[in-house]
Swiss-Prot record:
Gene Ontology BP terms: cytosolic ribosome assembly
Source species taxonomy: Archaea, Methanobacteriati, Methanobacteriota, Stenosarchaea group, Methanomicrobia
InterPro entries linked: eIF6
Functional description taken from the UniProt entry: Binds to the 50S ribosomal subunit and prevents its association with the 30S ribosomal subunit to form the 70S initiation complex.
Key word Transmembrane helix present: no
Protein name, UniProt field: Translation initiation factor 6
């Protein structure tokens, strides 16, 4: 089975696609081979849409199996496409790149530390999980500095012990550090995963792949 992937030659697949357990939101122009790899590795239903007229879906969408948090600048037809599968919350204001600022699964959500209380309460209501403010390796865009599934959470290799402890206090899932695409700590930029499987950016090394498999509980070979 394919374990590494590129989006139009770009290894940062997490910027262009958002997996919400049983669905994957992908740009309409994604290639047939790219879409086939997602379906084979992750067993997902594909939701083909832009967000804000853009293909950087992973940066603009977050969520879990209950709900989706989408940039407040998304167009009505884009919102409707996602609403067929999830309750949608629009993330308004200057901090609207939901995929960058929210790390979520079905147990928890971690958000940019400067996010306001009212928005956090909305996220809690839509996703149905406790929400914490967090940095990872001091990085506020936790949605790209980590990747959460219902099997485990992979975070930036230089995450501090206190950051890991805060995250571990919200979940009973394994939390581990790692890198993607030959040394990038921004693991969310180059990873797509769910309870079924995972795909990493095409530049990801064998060692990095092994770490991903370990944190998410997949046995290689």
């Amino acid at each position: 089975m394919i374990r590494t992937l590129a989006y139009e030659g770009d290894p940062h697949i997490g910027i262009f696609t958002r997996v919400l357990e049983d669905i994957a939101v992908v740009p309409p122009e994604a290639s047939a081979d790219y879409c086939a790899a997602l379906k084979e590795a992750l067993g997902v239903t594909l939701v083909k849409t832009h967000v804000q007229g853009s293909s950087i879906i992973g940066s603009l969408v977050s969520g879990n199996s209950r709900g989706a948090i989408v940039s407040g600048l998304a167009y009505p037809d884009e919102i409707r496409a996602i609403e067929e599968y999830r309750e949608v919350m629009l993330l308004e204001g200057s901090m609207n790149a939901a995929g960058n600022v929210i790390l979520a699964n079905d147990q928890m959500a971690a958000v940019h530390p400067d996010m306001d209380n009212a928005t956090i309460e909305q996220i809690h209501s839509v996703l149905g999980v406790p929400v914490i403010r967090l940095t990872l390796s001091g990085i506020k865009t936790v949605g790209m500095a980590g990747y959460a599934t219902n099997r485990g959470i992979l975070v930036h290799a230089r995450s501090a012990g206190r950051e890991l402890a805060t995250l571990e206090s919200t979940t009973d899932l394994p939390v581990g550090t790692g890198t993607i695409n030959m040394g990038s700590g921004l693991v969310g930029t180059g990873l797509l995963a769910n309870s079924t499987g995972y795909l990493a950016g095409i530049e990801t090394s064998g060692f990095e792949m092994g770490r991903i498999a370990d944190v998410f509980g997949f046995v290689e070979g």
